[in-house]
Amino acid sequence: MASSTVSVVLSLFLLLLTQANSANIQSFSFKNFNSPSFILQGDATVSSGKLQLTKVKENGIPTPSSLGRAFYSSPIQIYDKSTGAVASWATSFTVKISAPSKASFADGIAFALVPVGSEPRRNGGYLGVFDSDVYNNSAQTVAVEFDTFSNSGWDPSMKHIGIDVNSIKSIATVSWDLANGENAEILITYNAATSLLVASLVHPSRRTSYILSERVDITNELPEYVSVGFSATTGLSEGYIETHDVLSWSFASKLPDDSTAEPLDLASYLVRNVL
């Protein structure tokens, strides 16, 4: 998968949205971040045009026990209770995770859809997104995690990408070899026609790519309106720390006029033609 694939596919998605009925489209794109566009929680800040999710000392060294979240300031409607229509959506972002030690990392970053007004959850291995490794529908949260530390209670025994539904215990995972201090280009899509959530990650410097997918019925797992954004945490001790910077971010969704309208089939297109 070429390093430009993420941006090319998102551009295609935006074009499809534009050519479709312009109603019910929600989209935004940031190459430089500014605070008024975001709800910042915990240690998250906007610094030099990037989202810096976890705390960093003046010397550039990350701090332990840091938690930061950043969500787009406007709610996103992902389905319509009155019509039964469900939105297809895609998001693309570039992140960089850097750790002082090449041997120890913690804990990771997640892209999350959470209830509007949600507050940070537990620190450390819970990534600030969940409180438990037991499924709890009242959490009303779906996330894709990029987990740099294996917690023995619920994680596989390696760094991994995971899809989380109302629990920090992932319903699907794939092993991931983090490129320390290098950019990762990430694309996540949701296909309303198939309920398929697809996540892909590329390290352009290594020409390595990872892909993960799982079916998720978001009408059963999420509220009608959500906040979309990021959450990240560092480990609880000095030996397990890392930075979490979001360098760019785009998001687009299309909610059909009714439940019978044909949704965008982007996820299937990716699997067949790109990934």
UniProtKB/Swiss-Prot annotation:
<keyword id="KW-0430">Lectin</keyword>
<dbReference type="InterPro" id="IPR013320">
    <property type="entry name" value="ConA-like_dom_sf"/>
</dbReference>
<dbReference type="InterPro" id="IPR001220">
    <property type="entry name" value="Legume_lectin_dom"/>
</dbReference>
<dbReference type="InterPro" id="IPR019825">
    <property type="entry name" value="Lectin_legB_Mn/Ca_BS"/>
</dbReference>
<feature type="signal peptide">
    <location>
        <begin position="1"/>
        <end position="22"/>
    </location>
</feature>
<dbReference type="InterPro" id="IPR000985">
    <property type="entry name" value="Lectin_LegA_CS"/>
</dbReference>
<dbReference type="Pfam" id="PF00139">
    <property type="entry name" value="Lectin_legB"/>
</dbReference>
<feature type="glycosylation site" description="N-linked (GlcNAc...) asparagine">
    <location>
        <position position="136"/>
    </location>
</feature>
<comment type="function">
    <text>Metalloglycoprotein, containing Ca, Mg, Mn, and Zn and the carbohydrates galactose, glucosamine, mannose, and fucose. It agglutinates erythrocytes of blood group A1. Has a high preference for GalNAc over Gal.</text>
</comment>
<keyword id="KW-0325">Glycoprotein</keyword>
<keyword id="KW-0106">Calcium</keyword>
<comment type="subunit">
    <text>Homotetramer.</text>
</comment>
<dbReference type="InterPro" id="IPR016363">
    <property type="entry name" value="L-lectin"/>
</dbReference>
<protein>
    <recommendedName>
        <fullName>Seed lectin subunit I</fullName>
    </recommendedName>
</protein>
<keyword id="KW-0732">Signal</keyword>
<dbReference type="GO" id="GO:0005537">
    <property type="term" value="F:D-mannose binding"/>
</dbReference>
<keyword id="KW-0465">Mannose-binding</keyword>
<feature type="site" description="Cleavage">
    <location>
        <begin position="265"/>
        <end position="266"/>
    </location>
</feature>
<dbReference type="InterPro" id="IPR050258">
    <property type="entry name" value="Leguminous_Lectin"/>
</dbReference>
<comment type="similarity">
    <text>Belongs to the leguminous lectin family.</text>
</comment>
